[in-house]
Structures are given as C-alpha cells and as structure tokens.
Amino acid sequence: MSKLSCIADLLAIGADGAIAIGAPGRTPAQSPMTFAALRALAGEVVDSLNRNGIGRGDRVAIVLPNGPEMAVAFMTVAAGAVTAPLNPAYREDEFNFYLDDLKARALIVQQGDDTPARAVAQRRGIDVLELVPDLD
C-alpha cells in the first residue's frame, strides 16, 4: 500500500459512489456524502479559499458542533489550508487565546450561530465565513 501524504491522496482512494461521510439519524434526503461529492466540494472550497487569499500554510479555525457538517468542513478546508477545529463550548477568553495563538486567517461558523468566536474574530480582523448546511 502506498503512503498517503495529503488529503487529496486520501480522497482519491475512495470509489466515486462509496460513502465518504455518513449522516446517521438524518432524513433520507440528507443522504451520506459520496467520495465523488466530497472531492467536488473540496475543490470548490479550496477555490473559494484561494479567491479570498487563503492557501496552504494559512490557518482556518472551525467552530462547529460535532457531526457530518464538521467532518465535511474539516476535510474540505484541509485540502487547501491548515484546519484548526475549536470547541464550540469555549468561552470568549478561550477563543481570544486560541485565535491569537493560531494566527488564524479565517474562522468558519455555522450560519446564524451566536458563538463568541464570531465577535472575537471580528475584533481581531479575522474573516468570518459562514457554513450554510444543505438540509434538503
């Protein structure tokens, strides 16, 4: 077996129709994500990050609850930048410490989420990117 050296290698090994990320407890319309869909989304996310001046070596903090959306965000961002998942239960002072320590270029939060991470990022001049889950 060859050595996997990056996210692209990991995504490439899955058959197009194979399940890459499951969505237990979701409605049938919210089906699991296939490797083909995850690869396509990773390309879109990397392109979007690059258009916003974020690339390899740049740190992107992610504040999302555990679940398929977090897994997808982590994998797709990691395809083009350094991911730094942060606990959504952190307090404002903890987010301040970690966002400073990470030197994050962007923060991803769920649309409409009132996390203190958002206010900290805005005060620090860190771009806040909102994840809009596809619930159809």
Question: Where are the model-predicted features located?
Answer:
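A short N-terminal helical cap/helix-turn-helix that marks the beginning
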Residues: 1-22, 40
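Residues at the C-termini of beta-strands that transition into short coil/loop
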Residues: 11-14, 25, 36, 111, ...
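A generic structural signal for alpha->beta connector loops
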Residues: 18, 29, 80, 125-126
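Conserved AMP-binding/adenylate-forming core of the ANL superfamily
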Residues: 20-67, 71-75, 91-96
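Structural core segment of the AMP-binding/adenylate-forming
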Residues: 51-52, 81-136
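Hydrophobic/aromatic ligand-binding patch that stacks against planar heteroaromatic rings
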Residues: 75-76, 120
